[in-house]
């Protein structure tokens, strides 16, 4: 169980730091170098409200962390699929394939595409909410739940595989 948990957490942390670092680099290049950020420009999400209030650093930090949580979900999902299937290429393709499958399956359901319940909110997009802190809290909770479910499902699969190896 500890091996599987650490493997899954490694995937989540890899995704967290990769996407978080990429978001930071993007914001540095777009904002600092190109000069595209001001109090009324930049990221077109609910985090924009913090920029408009003058809390630019806090708004950008929460935006980067929001994206990094998406990366954690994507990284753990890829690692989870490498536990289910003994093929590293499945782990690389799984997050996008899973996202496309969920989006296709949920198309007819009455779920708003900008809500936390829509799959793109789990993997990439910033969903809507009444406050910045509600949106960030929902994203953190969704990431915690999705990663927890993957850990709970992955541990017995890996135990069974190691017993029969």
List PLM regions with ranges:
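Junction motif at the cytosolic side of a transmembrane helix
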Residues: 144-165
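Secretory targeting signals
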Residues: 5-83, 122-140
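Residue-level recognition of pore/gate-forming positions within transmembrane alpha-helices
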Residues: 11, 96-100, 147-148
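Transmembrane helix segments
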Residues: 82-117
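Transmembrane helix-loop junctions in multipass membrane proteins, especially transporters and channels
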Residues: 27-39, 87, 107-115, 158-164
